[in-house]
Amino acid sequence: MSIRDGCSARFIFVTGGVVSSLGKGLAAASIGALLQARGFRVRLRKLDPYLNVDPGTMSPAQHGEVFVTDDGGETDLDLGNYERFTGVNTTKEDNITAGRIYQQLLAKERRGDYLGHTVQVIPHVTDLIISFILSNDDGADFIICEIGGTVGDIESQPFLESIRQVSYRLSKNFTIFVHLTLVPCVGSAGELKTKPTQHSVKELSSLGIQPDIILYRSAEPLPQYQSAKIANFCNVSADNVIPALDVESMYKLPVMYHAHKLDTQILSHFGMGAPEPDLTKWANVLTMVNNARNVVTIAIIGKYTKFLDAYTSLTEALDHAGMHSGIKIQVKWVDSRLPVRESDLHDVDGVLIPGGFGDDGVDGKVLAIGYARANGIPMLGICMGMQLAAIEFALNVAKLEDANSTEFNQACKNPIVVELPWLQKGEGEYLLGGSMRLGSCTYRLSADSRVASVYGSTVINERCRHRYCINPQYKNVLEEHGLSFTGMSDSHGLVEVLELQSHPWFIGVQFHPEFKSSPFAPHPLFTSFVQNVLQIKQRGFMHKSVSAAAILVPGSSVVS
């Protein structure tokens, strides 16, 4: 673990108490950004206590989005925040779950690696967790480890025991514990209660971990006497009781935490000095957020509209593009599982169809695509959104009867979308998890295409996550009717990009551009989309004369 100046990496462990979803991931990302702004090299990791091997097969309604890394990892959404805040690419080795730990453990036991010993949680499970924490520091000065779940959860105990052991082995000079809790506001008088924080710290201390810094989540800072109360009863320095206040934009968090000296206290704990952080780029982002003057409404048509964590990277990518273009993005969420009505779409300036799986809500997405295509509304389709754009075009323009995807109907007459050739089911067990095309891929764009103009290049790299693709047998017939396939994969010859050149702005991509957008470098595809949404709105190019009722969806009869 040697790094600059011959020192060892310092470890920052971020835990959470009272309730989940308090913002541990954003706190960890903010700490990373602040230390980075002081000239240090950081690496961030997430340890999840659930028994799934990875989040790839988990419902977004329960877990939120699956963030895909360059090397093909299906990881927790917090890794997306780590990348957006620090600009440091994460890998599949930066996210571990209890399921993956037990998978490794049982494989070792079957091989006989434990030489007849009784395999137990301690030391065998904890040793594997510790090995993950200490591995692959890549020359980082600080490794920030977020522990998923809440103190008190049974499944979290092996992870908490592991970080306790790391602290014991490396000494306090190389580890620090940051604990995030909730200070709820109770009653009509708005009284802030510190007792849940005290109980959470008591629970953590009973496991052998004494937090060094307490971040309390609250709508407003505590009065000095209540902050002192937390310090006294939680055995923490008063300077280390730091507010984690509600903010309008997550990109205000590093500035806010620095104002409350979080990074200063961390460095003080380690006895380290450093220059003041250069937060200019963060100040610039906040200025852009506050200075957006133009407003556009973009409809996102999806089936997880009540669980917005399912679309975290997507909405952030829209915001990045908007803030750099002086445009405020208003998202109109449309649940595709419900009947999508014309009234859901008539007042929007752009339509975005995100990725997804399964036939639930497909008809609503196809109807929205057709309405956007027919009425000149800018449309961006991602992953399944691109596949459905091809199906909608086949049904309503090429007039191909029963055009569909074999994902939804294996017996359809015109399978526009089919399973990837190398994934098609053969004999033996079919594994759903970890069996998709994943990670960074190289794509070649047609030189005269709109998308090549957007990227400023004919060769791009993007991250993908899919099991189905456009059927190459239908490429010619769809092109004959006006649909252009302007991007192909470099290695497999798959259709990766489509566009409708007769339309003001209509692009579908098989990959996930949202995973590579940041507040400091918005993704060019989202920037082009958002800017064209505004321009087309201002110029009045959208006519909206074609009724949604005229759009055929999969399973409809084709009218010649």
From Swiss-Prot:
Stretch list, region Amidoligase domain: 1-272
Residues at which ATP binds: S21, L22, G23, K24, G25, L26, D78
One term of GO molecular function: identical protein binding
Active-site residues, record numbering mapped to chain: C383 (nucleophile), H512, E514
A cellular component annotation (GO) from this entry: cytosol
Record family assignment: Belongs to the CTP synthase family.
Subunit text: Homotetramer.
This protein's name: CTP synthase
Organism listed in the record: Anaplasma marginale (strain St. Maries)
Taxonomic classification: Bacteria, Pseudomonadati, Pseudomonadota, Alphaproteobacteria, Rickettsiales
The gene coding this protein: pyrG
